[in-house]
């Protein structure tokens, strides 16, 4: 049996390497005994296309999944295909299960801002914690609000937050234990631990 996770993000080869390294570090920190093969697939539509192709060509027993931003709050994390159909008009591939669609709710930046200690360690004393979005109901916040507040809170830091290389550098340093408080991250870990 093999396992493969297609991840949204990282268009350049360098960023794809950083993306894989960051998610690998995060999953190892979560204590996964087996690791899926990780592929940084570029934009979310490209991740979905790569997932569909791999799902169609899978061997018996293989676990193929994708991890994409939900882009909007999710009514029911256990029914991601319903959300993806409503939001993106993505049809669930034949034979695909809900466990194969994993969501970062509402975006990867939500996971990043959830670990305040990790952010302080990564950005140092110039991080403006008061400018970050409140932790309460974090996954119900609009992705642009989360992203903009993260950029604003780090604007005076020498390594101010930007999508791409810098986003993966900070993601790699986050605590899986802290992120486990987020329902979407907890679901990712539960699914991977059950399926690997």
Predicted regions and their residues:
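C-terminal accessory helical subdomains adjacent to catalytic cores in phosphodiester-
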Residues: 1-2, 13, 17-38, 48-196
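Short hydrophobic beta-strand that contains or immediately precedes a catalytic carboxylate
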Residues: 5-7
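Short, conserved secondary-structure transition motifs
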Residues: 42-46
């Amino acid at each position: 049996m093999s396992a493969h996770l297609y991840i949204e993000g990282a268009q350049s080869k360098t960023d794809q390497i950083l993306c894989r390294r960051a998610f690998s570090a995060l999953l190892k920190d979560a204590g996964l005994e087996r690791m899926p093969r990780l592929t940084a697939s570029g934009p979310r539509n490209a991740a979905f296309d790569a997932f569909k192709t791999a799902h169609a060509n899978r061997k018996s027993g293989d676990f193929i999944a994708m991890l994409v931003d939900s882009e909007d709050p999710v009514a029911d994390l256990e029914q991601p295909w319903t959300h993806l159909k409503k939001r993106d008009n993505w049809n669930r591939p034949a034979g695909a299960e809900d466990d194969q669609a994993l969501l970062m709710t509402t975006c990867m930046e939500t996971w990043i801002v959830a670990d305040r200690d990790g952010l302080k360690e990564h950005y140092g004393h110039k991080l403006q914690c008061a400018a970050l979005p409140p932790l309460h109901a974090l996954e119900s916040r609009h992705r642009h609000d989360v992203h903009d507040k993260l950029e604003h809170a780090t604007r005076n830091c020498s390594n101010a937050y930007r999508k791409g290389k810098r986003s993966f550098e900070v993601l790699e340093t986050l605590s899986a234990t802290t992120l486990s408080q987020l329902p979407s991250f907890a679901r990712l870990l539960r699914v991977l631990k059950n399926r690997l």
